[in-house]
């Protein structure tokens, strides 16, 4: 898939209308191709301190879509490892933490 295809797919499935609109704006402006490349050059990776990155639109930034996908993956794995898993979610004062907390809680709740 091209960067454009990945970005279009991302915007179509982004649960946050603001970040989805930002990606669509990037796609419409050829002068911002480098920024589009930066945001879609590969997914944000889970490191020793968890998911960390600049908050913003795209697969390589912290946003609700990344939190949704990561939480879904965690719950899928955890559900195969433990019967009736329990999960604790925390948040802090960093920008977006409360929204990310709520998003993770919604995914966990939907997973049962």
Where do the protein language model's features map onto the residues?
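An N-terminal, well-structured beta->alpha segment
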Residues: 7-104, 110
């Amino acid at each position: 898939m091209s960067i454009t295809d990945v970005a279009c797919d991302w915007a179509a499935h982004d649960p946050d209308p603001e970040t989805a609109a930002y990606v669509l704006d990037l796609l419409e402006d050829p002068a911002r191709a480098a920024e589009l490349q930066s945001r879609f050059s590969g997914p944000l990776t889970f490191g020793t301190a968890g998911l960390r990155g600049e908050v913003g639109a795209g697969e390589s930034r912290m946003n609700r879509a990344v939190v949704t996908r990561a939480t879904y993956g965690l719950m899928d794995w955890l559900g195969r490892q433990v019967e009736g898993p329990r999960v604790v979610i925390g948040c802090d004062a960093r920008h977006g933490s409360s929204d990310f907390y709520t998003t993770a809680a919604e995914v966990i709740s939907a997973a049962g």
